UniProtKB/Swiss-Prot annotation:
<dbReference type="GO" id="GO:0005615">
    <property type="term" value="C:extracellular space"/>
</dbReference>
<dbReference type="GO" id="GO:0005576">
    <property type="term" value="C:extracellular region"/>
</dbReference>
<dbReference type="GO" id="GO:2000406">
    <property type="term" value="P:positive regulation of T cell migration"/>
</dbReference>
<keyword id="KW-0202">Cytokine</keyword>
<keyword id="KW-0929">Antimicrobial</keyword>
<dbReference type="GO" id="GO:0060326">
    <property type="term" value="P:cell chemotaxis"/>
</dbReference>
<protein>
    <recommendedName>
        <fullName>C-C motif chemokine 20</fullName>
    </recommendedName>
</protein>
<feature type="disulfide bond">
    <location>
        <begin position="32"/>
        <end position="58"/>
    </location>
</feature>
<feature type="disulfide bond">
    <location>
        <begin position="33"/>
        <end position="74"/>
    </location>
</feature>
<dbReference type="GO" id="GO:0006955">
    <property type="term" value="P:immune response"/>
</dbReference>
<dbReference type="GO" id="GO:0019722">
    <property type="term" value="P:calcium-mediated signaling"/>
</dbReference>
<keyword id="KW-0964">Secreted</keyword>
<comment type="similarity">
    <text>Belongs to the intercrine beta (chemokine CC) family.</text>
</comment>
<keyword id="KW-0732">Signal</keyword>
<dbReference type="GO" id="GO:0008009">
    <property type="term" value="F:chemokine activity"/>
</dbReference>
<dbReference type="InterPro" id="IPR001811">
    <property type="entry name" value="Chemokine_IL8-like_dom"/>
</dbReference>
<dbReference type="GO" id="GO:0007165">
    <property type="term" value="P:signal transduction"/>
</dbReference>
């Protein structure tokens, strides 16, 4: 009888723990860039971008480029090549 109660209590605690972990994970589905790439990306590999702003929950401003291979690459928005690609992609969207 004692073992059954302990087993039931352990099972209930496990279910509760899994439920709580699932909720906290869903609430934080946004990843922040912590640094920038050292490489210059070619525009032909980039399909889109997202702006990350430091005042919206992340530590640094960044441009997150989305590649054809479904990778996310963090880039410094102050660099010339980053500004060029953002301008290029923005023009493509306007012309659609």
């Amino acid at each position: 009888m004692c073992c059954t109660k302990s087993l039931l209590l352990a099972a209930l605690m496990s279910v509760l723990l899994l439920h709580l972990c699932g909720e906290s994970e869903a609430a934080s589905n946004f990843d922040c860039c912590l640094g920038y790439t050292d490489r210059i990306l070619h525009p032909k590999f980039i399909v889109g971008f997202t702006r990350q702003l430091a005042n919206e929950g992340c530590d640094i401003n960044a441009i997150i480029f989305h590649t054809k291979k479904k990778l996310s690459v963090c880039a410094n928005p102050k660099q010339t090549w980053v500004k060029y690609i953002v301008r290029l992609l923005s023009k493509k969207v306007k012309n659609m």
